[in-house]
Amino acid sequence: MWIFCLLLLFAAALRAQPPADHLPGTSRLTAAEEFSPLMVAGIDRALDRQLEETVAKRTRFWRRDPASPAAYTASVAPNRARLQQIIGAVDERRAPAVIEYVGGPDRPVLVAETERVRVFAVRWAVFEGVNGEGLLLEPKERVRARIVALPDADELPEALAGMIAGENAWALRLAESGCEVIVPALLDRRATWSGNPRIAMTDQTHREWIWRQSYELGRHPIGFEVQTVRAVLDAWAARSEKLPVGVAGYGEGGLIALYASAIDPRVDAALVSGYFQRREELWREPIYRRVFGLLKEFGDAEIASLVAPRTLVIEHSAGPKVDGPPSVEASRRKGAAPGVITPLTFAAVRLEVERARTLVAGVGSPVALVSGPDGAVVTPGSAPALQALLEGLGVPGPSIREPIVAPTVQARPDADARQQRRVAELSEFCQRLQRRSESGREALWQATTPQPGVDWAG
């Protein structure tokens, strides 16, 4: 009974005390602002800090051996394999590799011509159900080198071939200088065919539309387009006459040129224009440029180090400008990710080039940087940059020929139909891969040896 009375007295004493406004050993959390924005800002700062720290931490993934070109190439082979894996350039390309001329009764194979160059519409097999398409610029004189010229995503191959008045026809300049040139059509930044018309169309660019379908499958538009370039190299490698091979690109094409030359040692020299810079703010760029885990091991300088000891020319052009997703009609679903591409600054380009030069010091040719006076931008495919590319290929003979005579256009390929085929083929490839994934997973697990005492089927 006395215990019961004691408890009542203790409870009454507790009720008499004012309630505590915080737990012992703590202080009250007070702020004039909302806590959610504070939390987001803190996460933002933490991630920015981690991104900056990745640059120094990348060294743990690399074991470069500059003793000789062969030793260096062997020492970076694991890094090359990892880059190829994370961009999804892993699917077997179709064989035999053949460049096909495309034409018909109402579509001449020869689409344009100058005194020194013929231009043809072509295609080539890449994967099951996926083709590359574009233009072949064939010199009438003896061919001295072969080059894949990659436009920006919003440029047409016809522009680089001089078939569109007022455009920068740098691929034609290479062809006029004795190079066989193939200009592939890339996925562009329109949203015309992004979606399923039976369900809904979206405001996602074609690049984002394919990125979203491929990402969960371990694939990527970058990997698809790198493989498109490599399929051209396969076709050239099958020819009896062996010639130097180069890859050049501007904007999104510069990105593909950099990655393709880093992954495929058959590329003897590469030119990257309007793309190369520090990548620690990649999160600001369009989502279709994002590769899972990329910055942990690779910035542009590290990817450039995979090109060594071969020639790499960086051209400081302004690069494309993208303000965000495309404007579309109101009936479309709005779900495109934000992201911008801003013109490059010389300081950012030079800083990354210097980093690349440090990484490959003593190995082959240093990374070349072409710019205007005092770091001014140059037009993509400037004469000094193209000349440096040809020198890297070891091409003898005259310099880049000036001026260009505009070609006589016989027929203009249907660029819209070509782009629609590109989007549809890659979309179907991803969907087919998705349908086959379950059996692939089952095969993977069946090949796994269970540990003693573990019931995998349970």
Summary of predicted features, one role per range:
Residues 2-12:
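Bacterial N-terminal signal peptides
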Residues 17-132, 142, 212-225, 230-234, ...:
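Alpha/beta-hydrolase-fold serine-hydrolase catalytic core, especially in secreted/extracellular enzymes
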Residues 136-140:
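Short, low-complexity Ser/Thr-rich regulatory SLiMs
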Residues 142-244, 250, 275-289:
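Cap/lid segment of the alpha/beta-hydrolase catalytic domain
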Residues 174, 260-261:
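Aromatic pocket-lining residues of Rossmann-like dinucleotide-binding sites
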Residues 240, 264-265:
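Active-site catalytic pocket residues across diverse enzymes, especially alpha/beta-hydrolases
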Residues 248-257:
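Gly/Ala-rich beta-loop-alpha elbow adjacent to hydrolase catalytic centers
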